[in-house]
């Protein structure tokens, strides 16, 4: 019990680094804060205190608090009686009780040596390196050896020597391959590896900090530094095996020397080893994977049934499962579907592409779930092999609850041709009329006015909207009369009138002309003007929609608001109007818009025939006015 209490006291005095080393030595999790690490170490001490763990605790404690020894002059002080000094002068230690005198209190500042030096690390610890899939070990040239710290300096140095046997030398020389550029490579190589000096499990490659390696006096190239993850962080190299074959002496009589320089770290030791290996390719590993065999398809079917089994406690049940036959790495159809045994998904990836990717940069990470997928855990899925062989024209399948599957054909969606957007007021669309032969049933045109309320009692069903053929009715515009007739704030649209000569009475009665009050009364000086006399041609027909609307009170006042009668507008018209139309047109009532043109009765009688000859203004521009 006393020894257990002493060990507990030692553990409680450890720092984070010592606690991590102790937990790593025992194979426990060494991540967490100091109080968590301390609790784990104390639990380890209470639960299973093996002799090796006790020795490790004592070793770490001796490193943490090294004991000091006395020099020759200090040992002479111990032979004197307490309270006296070598020269008879009062000693400063005379006032200290003899029981409190320890060897550590008698040490000088520069005469400190270890009374019990720490136990040296084993030269050949029981360290095993993790096997590499792309390298096959042929022999061990240097067993895993500890990079021991021999001094208290920051930088350490170690020397190693190895020699090749004639058989090993012959293997290297026969594997030589000449590469482009006068370079030669060897498939059988001399490989140098570093790792942590831990015996709990097979160790991965791990470089010591500030590592420099010289082989036979020549500096060995190392992998480049990785970019630092944060500012101020010390750059690190990617830990991987080092090929020292180009620097080695390929001789059976001359040994090879290796000099290693690194920075020592308290509580962390490293190990070095040299192997003779044969480098493999992705194709060789694929053949080895095929040689392992294909997994029984029933395993995958059982996994599918397990995933699709309805959970009674869940309200949502999965009845089918879609899986792609495309490789997530190359976006191509699978050829050798494989996945790791540790993966819980059904999606497979192509084994050839996966091995080629790891040959360039070994990560061994599943491209589907981003979990570790080492080469030893890869399997070829037999169910997917059957699917690929039986279904060659689909890229996706669907699994059912019973483990069966069916191909998912890609649906070709018909392209929808969207009609061009219509323009005009109230969403009305007007389509151009094709000149040519038209059927007689299309001569009657129906116009739907959206301004009439749809809830009228007279209409049982809304009339079908039809497109009106268009012709342009020319209305003269006087030269130099800009601003004489201007539109108001309401937008104006284009007048569309049918091309035929007669219209039905239903069209004339459907025009809601009584709902448009005049915007402004007309002045007395332009009420007697007849604008139809200024049309360019005599044979031009008036549009019935224009003729009818001119008789109503909202004719042009809704679209043209008169803002004044400038003298330059009425000046050129006075001679013409006085000689031609002033006598033929009766005086209209003031304030009616129809007085601008003519009385409605006279226009209705002659709208179907040609107009009488009359003067017209040269250079007049035809305009189109909308009445809807």
Swiss-Prot record:
Cross-link Glycyl lysine isopeptide (Lys-Gly) (interchain with G-Cter in SUMO2) mapped to chain: 46, 56, 230, 307, 466, 482
Q: Which CDD domains match?
A: SP-RING_PIAS3
- Give the domain of life: Eukaryota
Q: Which GO terms describe its biological process?
A: negative regulation of DNA-templated transcription; negative regulation of gene expression; negative regulation of osteoclast differentiation; negative regulation of protein sumoylation; negative regulation of transcription by RNA polymerase II; positive regulation of gene expression; positive regulation of membrane potential; positive regulation of protein sumoylation
Q: In which pathway does it act?
A: Protein modification; protein sumoylation
Q: Which UniProt keywords apply?
A: Cytoplasm, Isopeptide bond, Metal-binding, Nucleus, Transcription, Transcription regulation, Transferase, Ubl conjugation, Ubl conjugation pathway, Zinc, Zinc-finger
EC number(s) from the headed UniProt entry? 2.3.2.-
Q: Where is the SAP domain?
A: 11-45
Q: What class of enzyme is it?
A: transferase
Q: How does it assemble?
A: Binds SUMO1 and UBE2I. Interacts with AR, BCL11A, GFI1, HMGA2, IRF1, MITF, NCOA2, as well as with STAT3, after treatment with IL6, CNTF or OSM and with STAT5, after PRL stimulation. Interacts with PLAG1. Interacts with ZFHX3. Interacts with MTA1. Interacts with CCAR2 (via N-terminus). Interacts with TRIM8. Interacts with PRDM1.
The domain comment in this protein's record states: The LXXLL motif is a transcriptional coregulator signature.
PANTHER family per the record? Answer: E3 SUMO-PROTEIN LIGASE PIAS3, ZINC FINGER MIZ DOMAIN-CONTAINING PROTEIN
Protein name as it appears in the record = E3 SUMO-protein ligase PIAS3
Which organism's genome codes for this protein? Answer: Rattus norvegicus
Q: Which gene is the coding source of this polypeptide chain? A: Pias3
